[in-house]
Amino acid sequence: MQIKIGEIESKLNKIIEEEGAAYFVLIDPDEKNYREIANHVKDYADAIIIGGSIGIINLDEVTKDIKEITGLPIILFPGNVDGVTKEADAVFFMSLMNSKNTYWNMTAPTLGALTIKKYGLETLPMAYLGIEPISKTAVGFVGEVNEIPQKKPEIAGLYSLSASYFGMRWAYLEAGSGAEYPVSNEMVGISKKLSGINIIVGGGIRTPEVAYEKVMSGADVIVTGTLTEKDPQAVVEMKKAIKKAGLDKLKMLSKK
């Protein structure tokens, strides 16, 4: 049986292939000013990720609002089995591979699978990898993450390779929301080189310069969330840096 890639994933792959990198903005549905954030980012992001909260209220309404405001692909990033709504376009069907708790590795996605099928959501199979300093953030605490040390980039590379063998097409290297520092360039590069799948990098990316470095190191997607909440206008320069890096990376690869 041939594996079918859905419309949203195909669209994102095309952006990555033609522009070298994509920019996703993470919006927390619990943010009171989510409509304002959505209005600010709609002309700059390639897709919107919704999620990251515990005990989300009014997820259907929030997702519908953001979709209507932005007109962009809406991808769910569930913090638990209750983080799914039929109002989205797709969902990251993910495993927190380096959690110490099997609930986050496999049980949670298994429990949510039937709801996803019922809603007809497109699934993007993804390895979610918690990278130092994620243990100091909410997701690290809740997800009981056995964080991957920054000084051991090859471990993230092996997880990403393992994910590709499991059939996952995306790996998210996550330092955590509001992290003190981002995933290292070396770790990004090794993960991309070993796995060949789409590498998403998020957490601690506060400046366009850092975003540029991550893309040039091998990142296919950059995610910002906390930065966007604090300064919605920051997405303008962030997009410029990501897209410039994407084109520069394509030129560099074409010469090899």
UniProtKB/Swiss-Prot annotation:
It is found in: Cytoplasm. Its cofactor is Mg(2+). One of its GO terms (biological process) is glycerophospholipid biosynthetic process. GO terms for molecular function: imidazoleglycerol-phosphate synthase activity; magnesium ion binding; phosphoglycerol geranylgeranyltransferase activity. It catalyses: sn-glycerol 1-phosphate + (2E,6E,10E)-geranylgeranyl diphosphate = sn-3-O-(geranylgeranyl)glycerol 1-phosphate + diphosphate. Pathway: Membrane lipid metabolism; glycerophospholipid metabolism. Sn-glycerol 1-phosphate binds at residues 172-178, 203-204, 225-226. GO terms for cellular component: cytoplasm. It comes from the Archaea. Keywords: Cytoplasm, Lipid biosynthesis, Lipid metabolism, Magnesium, Metal-binding, Phospholipid biosynthesis, Phospholipid metabolism, Transferase. InterPro entries: GGGP/HepGP_synthase_sf (IPR038597), GGGP_HepGP_synthase (IPR008205), GGGP_synth (IPR010946), IGPS_HisA/HisF (IPR050064). Mg(2+) binds at residues 28, 53. The keyword Transferase applies. The keyword Nucleotidyltransferase does not apply. Prenyltransferase that catalyzes the transfer of the geranylgeranyl moiety of geranylgeranyl diphosphate (GGPP) to the C3 hydroxyl of sn-glycerol-1-phosphate (G1P). This reaction is the first ether-bond-formation step in the biosynthesis of archaeal membrane lipids. NCBIfam families: GGGP, GGGP-family, PRK04169.1-2, PRK04169.1-5. This is Geranylgeranylglyceryl phosphate synthase. It comes from Methanococcus maripaludis (strain DSM 14266 / JCM 13030 / NBRC 101832 / S2 / LL).
